[in-house]
UniProtKB/Swiss-Prot annotation:
Segment forming the signal sequence: 1-23
PROSITE patterns cross-referenced by the UniProt entry: PROKAR_LIPOPROTEIN
Sections of the chain in a coiled coil: none
Name of this chain's protein: Type 3 secretion system pilotin
Alphabetical list of InterPro entries matching this protein: MxiM, MxiM_sf
Keywords assigned by UniProt, alphabetized: Cell outer membrane, Lipoprotein, Membrane, Palmitate, Plasmid, Signal, Virulence
Length: 142
């Protein structure tokens, strides 16, 4: 008989299994500091600047997002299988066009709410999903 107190343990174990089986690229390795290019999949993110890069630091569980117009850092966590990060962001005033600013704001809001990451070791790609839809891809070192 399973007691309700074990649900948190089940969710934790399922999260670990999901990340392990998906080949998620957040595992500690010598490549954890490499840059990842953010590639929009959903139309809401098409205006994200081409030079916006993302890097993970698995040692202190932080993410850095940066371009010529912005720099941001967040400590990430996993909660109920969702990847979350609340960013501290610095922008260069007047550097972004309005559409870019809206897309960047949506990106940080989505990451704060939590997303599902699905990794692929073969082609060094991470899919970022929200509500069952792929919104962005992270591609390592294009």
């Amino acid at each position: 008989m399973i007691r309700h107190g074990s649900n948190k343990l089940k969710i934790f174990i399922l999260s670990i299994l999901l990340l392990t089986l998906s080949g998620c690229a957040l595992k500690s390795s010598s490549n954890s500091e490499k840059e990842w290019h953010i590639v929009p999949v959903s139309k809401d993110y098409f205006s994200i600047p081409n030079d916006l890069l993302w890097s993970f630091n698995t040692t202190n569980k932080s993410i850095n997002v940066y371009s010529k117009c912005i720099s941001g850092k967040a400590v990430y966590s996993f909660n109920a299988g969702k990847f979350m990060g609340n960013f501290n962001v610095k922008e260069v005033d007047g550097c972004f066009m309005d559409a870019q600013k809206i897309a960047i704001d949506k990106l940080f809001s989505m990451l704060k709410d939590g997303v599902v990451l699905k990794g692929n070791k073969i082609n060094d790609t991470i899919l970022i999903e929200k509500d069952g839809e792929v919104k962005l891809k992270l591609i390592r070192g294009i």
